[in-house]
Amino acid sequence: MIALDQLPAGVRQAVEALQAANARLENTVLVKDQDLRRKDQIIQLQDEKIRLLNFQLWGPKGEKLSAAQTAWLFAEASVTAGEVQREAERPEAEKTPPPPRAKKPRAHHPGREPLPAHLERREIIIPCHPADCRCRQCGAERPVIGYETREELGCEPATFFVKVIKREKRGSHCLPEQGVATAPVPPRIVPKGKLADEFILEVLVQKYQQHNPVYRQLAALAENHGVELDRKTVTDALLAAGELLRPVVRAQAAELLRGHYVQVDETTVPVQTGEKTGRNHQGYFWEYSEPGGRVVFDFQMGRGRAGPAAFLKGFRGTVQCDGYAAYDDLGPDITFAGCLAHVRRGFFEAAKLAPLNPVPPEILATIGRLYAVEETARRTGLDAAQRLALRHKESGPVMTALKDRLVAIRQEIPPGGKLTQACDYALGQWSRLEVYLQDGAVEIDNNWCEGAMRPLALGRKNWLHLGSEQAGPKVAAIASLVETCRRLDLNLRAYLGDILPQLGDWPVNRVAELTPTVWKAAHKKVI
């Protein structure tokens, strides 16, 4: 091969020019190739977002994978993610069917369950046919020797009536200077209103426990009973009840914060403000609760840090929440616990967006092992110390392996995709996720808290928005006690029917006696 310096000057210059042009072209191709890869990545991310939105709109709501995505992960311990991928890519006709699951034997039906014993029994006796009431031989009446009995659950339509309240007035002719004595006004939710306490309570229970909005209730009242009521009159009565309940909820919040463990979450609520024509302001209900116990909703007009900072001021203990930044730096005495359900949700969405990718189902299967440990603890009734010991033995090694696997996955995948986001979120929350391995009272996730949000979200779909900013704290007070009573298995009508009329005259320093937990302990026969 002739060296370049051996060529004539003119030829050498031409070759050098061609080499320079070729280098420029190669550089251009490299830049274009990088640009195409970047655009492909953008398209892939946008495609993921579109698929995720479609899935959220039209897909199933439960976080379950299809059998095709999970069967091979559980077929046997030695099955690897690569084998899952290869199996998924094979033509459908060539795929090896997963091992059949054994059918569960059908449980023996115990028979019809009896209706609740506490319900009133109204007997309806059906007589025999007259021809069967007399003896065919002698004609004498045949005595009743028993009954063929069965029970049905009956009901009566709601009955409305007008209560005429007459307070006695007494005077004396022989001693006129005694004046006239009048019976005192009994305590009421709305002292001078035309709605009885039991009517207000019924509307409240239907709206906030059964999610039946006021306008539907009033429409049914007008159609079925011919009673027309102004909606504002009724909603004002509900807000009056909410205002009365606020001190009780403040006392319940004090009970909650005296503990060492609080779960926190937030959800949106539209608020009418009049500031923007045709648009509502987005307010927030912040939930503070304990698993299986007290629930306190705090209304705020925004999602900023000020809300949780004010509520949790002075609290010392563990706060379990998601990765929202507003929860950070709430105080030096607060330990933050993470939520594994939020981590799981990211990998679930990644699995739905890329059904052939074996990595998300693999991670979900590992997370499932952690939840299986929690189910064992729940089913066997372990206390906090016993549950912590079980977690150390069973869950600790799984968590260590899970973190190592997430780190390895993150190094293998490009940035920006849903799987990348899921890995980054999990690893960013890892120190908080491990808190449940250090305290047996802390749950593996925030699902108790999220569960309390669901009734509120369902009700919000029916009553649409709050009528004003001032209504927010009152509705929050009602929702707090409704959800707390549900968790405590406390009869809401009995509880509110007892405390609401008394609250107007109840001493402020004794409000703590009316919280659901205290009231339940004092009224065990009513529950």
What are these regions (language model features)?
Residues M1-P191, Q263-V264, P270, C321, ...:
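Short, flexible loop/hinge motifs at secondary-structure junctions
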Residues D5, V15, Q19, R142, ...:
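Short, positively charged, Gly/Tyr-enriched micro-motifs
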Residues G59, C133-C135, S172, V203, ...:
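Mobile genetic element proteins and their domesticated derivatives, centered on retroelements
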Residues L73, P116, D132-G139, Q210, ...:
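Gly/Pro-rich turn-and-neighbor structural signature
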Residues P143-G146, V180-A183, V271-T273, V296-D298, ...:
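Short helix/loop capping segments that flank catalytic or ligand/cofactor-binding pockets
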Residues D197-L201, Q209-N212, F297-L330, G472-A479:
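Structured ligand/cofactor/substrate-binding pocket environments in proteins
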Residues Y261-V262, G323, P332-A365:
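Conserved beta-strand -> loop -> alpha-helix junction used to position metal-binding or nucleic-acid-contacting
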Residues R316, Y324-A326, E362-I527:
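Acidic/histidine-rich catalytic cores and adjacent linkers
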